[in-house]
Amino acid sequence: MSAKLSKVDGQVSKEELIAVKDKLKIPENEIDQVGKIFNKAKEESTGYEPYAHQIAQIYNGNLNVLEEVINILFYIAESDGNVSQSELNMIEKIAQIFGLTEIQFNSIRESRKSSDKLNPYIVLESKPDDTIEIIRKRYLKLSKEHHPDLLMSKGVPQEVIDESKAKMRSINSAWDQVQKLKSN
C-alpha cells in the first residue's frame, strides 16, 4: 500500500522512499528485495484496495494496529512536504476499508498536526459542547486503546508501537488543552 500511496500523486519522491524505509525498518540485507517488491507494486495496475482488504482481514478487530497503519500512511504522504488530495482520498478510503469511522479517521488526521495546531476536541473524538465528564471518558478510552504497553503485549511491530507513542502524546496534549479550556 505504501508503494501505491507514493505513486498516487503522480510521482514517487526520494523523501517518500526514505519515509517508507524509515517507518518499515527494513533490514539492510533485505532493502534490494523490498525495493523490487515496492517498484513492482507501484507499477502494477492492481489498485490498493486488495492490499487494504488483506490487512483488514489479518488485523480484524485490532483497531490499534489498523489505526497505526493509517498513521504510517499519513507519515509517508507527509514526507514530501504536503499531502495531496489524491493521497488524502486514498488514505481515507483505506480507513473505510479498515472499518474506521469518519470520527476515528479525523482524529488520526488531526493528531498528525504539530501540537500547536491540534484541535483537541477532534483528537479526543468529541465536541466543544460536550461536558468535561464525557470528554474525560473518551480520553480514558483513547488512552487505553493506544497505550504502547498494550500493543507490546500483543506483539505488534515496533513501528506500530512508535506511532502509538506519538498518538499518546497527541491525546495527552489534547486532554491538557481541553482541561484548560473547560476550566475558564
Task: Give a label for each model feature.
Residues 1-7, 11-184:
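Small-residue-enriched hydrophobic alpha-helices in membranes
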